[in-house]
Amino acid sequence: MKLNFAATALLIGIFTLGLFCPAAVTAAPRVKHVFIISFDQGNPDLIQKSAMPVLHELAATGARTWSAYTVVPSITLPAHTSMLTGVGPQAHQVLWNDYIPSNGLVKIPTIFSLAKEHGLVTAMFVGKEKFKHLLLPGSVDAFVWPHPESDAKAVAKAFAAQVATLKPNLCLIHFLDPDTAGHKYGAQSPEKMRALADCDAALKIVRDAIAAAGLAGSSVIILTADHGSHDIINPAGKSVGTHNTAETEDVKIPWVAWGQGVKKNFTITAPVLQYDTAATALWLLHLPLPDYFWGRPVTSAFK
């Protein structure tokens, strides 16, 4: 059967539209909200042994690996920068670990700035001032550092007070307590385990606030850490926690996903690296991954 010219042109037009029209190929986001919760110095082995019923429930009913890996240097600011830019320290060049205003801001886009390019709402609730180095102009709608009370409970309460109004599409929540306790009392100390338990109570505040805001059914929560730690004996002869090496105790971190579209009771066997969190967040929100990204979405964790 022969097609006339008009019919042929129509078919070609439909085919071309399907291939090349952005409106035709742009899919809806897999979720509307991604909450990344980072436990500073969150050794996965200690987390599994600590009194953390909320986190353990999310891990058991979601997807998890207790053997994800962070970057080197395994310290807070470089690691979180990788978590939020999708590249390693060699690329983002944030190699310091204090708030040093003269060092300026990260030189490459964060996932917050990429999200803002697509009109999304972004937020950061953090326990340390050094995160200001990641505040690219116009990239974060709400940045909250509840100084001087910046422990996990204070951060969680600040989040709970604003989440229903903000309804952020992309949000980082950072709990500093394990790092504080680990450095002072030891990487595996009872004090650090209590700090992790305090973080779990804060996690409950966050989870309940997400639900109360009506966002639970359209959200994914990612639970992870910047680094682990190990013990050393300080000059006073006391065992204290430290990190910043490539040793397993310092670089192994947890990675848990829970929420809409996450596989139930699933063990992630594929390798997960620190910068994969950035890629996973963009993938969930159906935002394009930059070509320069090192990270790749942890797609195996999702249905």
Where in the sequence are the language-model features?
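Positively charged n-region of N-terminal signal peptides that target proteins for export
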Residues: 1-6
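Bacterial N-terminal signal peptides
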Residues: 9-20
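Boundary at the C-terminal end of the N-terminal hydrophobic targeting segment
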Residues: 23-27
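Active-site-proximal alpha/beta segments of enzymes that process anionic O-linked groups
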Residues: 31, 41, 45-166, 277-283, ...
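Metal-dependent active-site segment of extracytoplasmic phospho-/sulfohydrolases and closely related
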Residues: 35-38, 54, 198-241, 281
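Extracytoplasmic/secreted cell-surface and envelope-processing proteins
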Residues: 45-48, 132-136, 179-185, 230-234, ...
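Substrate-binding rim/cap in mid-to-C-terminal beta-strand-loop elements of soluble/periplasmic
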Residues: 84, 242-286, 299-302
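Active-site His/acidic residue clusters
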Residues: 133-140, 160-201, 205
